């Protein structure tokens, strides 16, 4: 019997377009023999539109941009009515706010359906980089020195540099794909970067610059997660790995696996698994960390990592254990069902 898969994508975040590309990769690599594949597009205005029973290849992102005249509530209700609750798994591919902050996960839990990826708590904790760093600090996870600022805080630029380093990165706490990130070495640059980051979020993070390769490690699993071999994006002619370098720069190269000392690689993989469990994650995530002088610093966790042709997550499993993209997605769907059944087994009454 075919499973009904509903790929949920789009959303109101700054990573809307990336989500559409991830959804296309997903839809095209899900076996149409195993699955009845459906797509649910969430417009920027939060209207839901469903494309049912997809059997042909989606050749462009434009095919997945859908519209409706219904209101938000009407469109959501219409989609819920169309979802077959039997033998069904929801596959969220919404990046950034709304998709990675626990919002959509809570919505699906209300529907009492299995879904791929992290739970509400893990998603919410990892979405805010400031809170993530606070938890890392309490648990002695190695990371860059940092300062969190809120919109109406008083701050001293000189003190921020003293608490971090002579060069820093400023980023919104609740954005991904390097949206709103700027580097600063002077007080003038820092003030400009702070004001820029506050355009995207009311909480921002100022972090010490660590110069060294940024490892990306895919992690998959529920109670017993497994980390992939590390990969690195090699970038050219840009200061850091920004949005354009991630998705638009043809010169950006993937090094998978990243050549490094065998013991250090094993340490990095174990560290990725450790923070995955620490943050109460399930399904899948990507853990990013810097390596310098044989030391590791965890940077961030992406609970809905990119699944585009330029994304690291599926490629890392190919170089780790020769899994195809389709096999990765099959595994994630299986993990979703496993987690759902486990949670349903817990008592809700005394």
Swiss-Prot record:
Enzyme class: ligase
Example GO biological process: cell wall organization
EC number(s) on file: 6.3.2.4
Binding site for Mg(2+) 1: 288, 300
Location(s), subcellular: Cytoplasm
This protein's UniProt keywords: ATP-binding, Cell shape, Cell wall biogenesis/degradation, Cytoplasm, Ligase, Magnesium, Manganese, Metal-binding, Nucleotide-binding, Peptidoglycan synthesis
Predominant location category: cytoplasm
Details of cofactor binding: Binds 2 magnesium or manganese ions per subunit.
Known catalytic reactions: 2 D-alanine + ATP = D-alanyl-D-alanine + ADP + phosphate + H(+)
Binding-site residues for ATP, renumbered to this chain: 161-216
Function: Cell wall formation.
Protein name per UniProt: D-alanine--D-alanine ligase
Biological classification of the source: Bacteria, Bacillati, Bacillota, Tissierellia, Tissierellales
């Amino acid at each position: 019997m075919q499973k009904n898969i509903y790929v949920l994508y789009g959303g109101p975040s700054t990573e809307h377009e990336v989500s559409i590309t991830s959804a296309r990769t997903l839809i095209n690599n899900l076996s149409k023999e195993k699955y009845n594949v459906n797509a649910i597009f969430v417009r920027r205005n939060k209207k839901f539109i469903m494309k049912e029973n997809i059997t042909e290849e989606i050749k462009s992102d434009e095919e997945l941009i859908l519209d409706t005249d219904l209101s938000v509530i009407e469109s959501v209700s219409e989609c819920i009515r169309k979802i077959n609750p039997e033998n069904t798994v929801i596959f969220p591919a919404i990046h950034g706010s709304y998709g990675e902050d626990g919002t959509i996960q809570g919505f699906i839990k209300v529907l009492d359906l299995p879904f791929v990826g992290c739970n509400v708590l893990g998603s919410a904790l990892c979405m805010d980089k400031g809170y993530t760093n606070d938890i890392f600090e309490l648990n002695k996870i190695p990371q860059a020195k940092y300062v969190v600022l809120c919109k109406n805080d008083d701050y001293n630029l000189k003190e921020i540099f003293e608490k971090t380093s002579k060069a820093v990165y400023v980023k919104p706490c609740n954005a991904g794909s390097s949206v709103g990130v700027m580097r600063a070495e002077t007080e003038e640059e820092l003030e400009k970067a702070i004001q820029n980051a506050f355009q995207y979020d009311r909480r921002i993070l100022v972090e010490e610059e660590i110069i060294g390769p940024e490892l990306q490690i895919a992690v998959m699993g529920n109670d017993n997660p497994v980390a992939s071999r590390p990969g690195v994006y090699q970038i050219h002619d840009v200061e850091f790995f920004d949005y354009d370098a991630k998705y638009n720069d043809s010169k950006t190269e993937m090094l998978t696996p990243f050549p490094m000392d065998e013991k250090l690689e094993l340490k990095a993989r174990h560290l990725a698994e450790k923070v995955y469990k620490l943050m109460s994650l399930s399904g899948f995530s990507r853990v990013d960390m810097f390596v310098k002088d044989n030391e590791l610093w965890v940077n961030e966790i992406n609970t809905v990592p990119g699944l585009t042709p330029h994304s690291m997550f599926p490629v890392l499993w190919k170089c780790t254990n020769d899994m195809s993209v389709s096999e990765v997605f099959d595994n994630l769907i299986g993990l979703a069902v496993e987690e759902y059944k486990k949670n349903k087994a817990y008592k809700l009454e005394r």
